[in-house]
Amino acid sequence: MRIKSILLSLSAVVALSAGVANAATNLVTNGNFSDTSQGGNKQLAYTTNNIEANRTTLDGWTSSNRNDRYNFVLDTAIANTDKSVKWMKTSIAGGLGQGNVFASDSQYLPGTLSQNITGLTAGGLYTLTFDFALAQQVGFNGVNNDNFWQVGFGDVNPTQNSALLSIANGGFSGWKTATMTFAATSTSQVLSFLAQGTGPGAPPFLLLDNVSLISAVPEPSTWGMMLGGLGLVGFLARRRRAAKLA
């Protein structure tokens, strides 16, 4: 009976720790690109002022490049149809990529997508995760090799690259998940994504979704809850031992 009680208590601690971990605050605003100024399925504007009807912006994000040309918000539900602002040859919907996704052509005036992240602790480590994929536009042919997202976080940290994605003519890479760790050097830093590729290919569109940045080290409150749970297990064990000796 004593062992069963301790095991139940341990299970409670594990569940508590997992719940706290899952509740870690995502410091990225609009990481799934669902919030836009003028709807999805449009080309991104480089400014929030006087936006044309066929342009949109992503809440929390800035799209920067010459004449705001080849950065887009695509709707995965229609991306492989002629209703899409950029018609992909295959479906890009999947378990990871759903709804709005950010799309950029690495070979034709790609623009940096960036967001200023606040609430950081200088010297703290942060884990960045995001989902990404590679697809090809209708009307073009050719192999697309070695495309990747170049990720920056502040002016001091070196950039990091996602895994290379390559597809055959008309192919789709499927959705992948990238995980990176960065150190904060100040209380606010700019997180940025830039589509890159080593070969011209034929309109390779890199896709991005579900961007998340969380502290890599549990906050003091998290440690307190975990230690409190472990203390409870110890207390129950001592109480049962004392009851048995009495």
Where are these regions (language model features)?
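Short, threonine-centered small-residue motifs that mark membrane-proximal processing/anchoring sites
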Residues: L7, A12-T25, P204-F235
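Bacterial Sec-dependent N-terminal signal peptides
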Residues: M1-S9, A242-K244
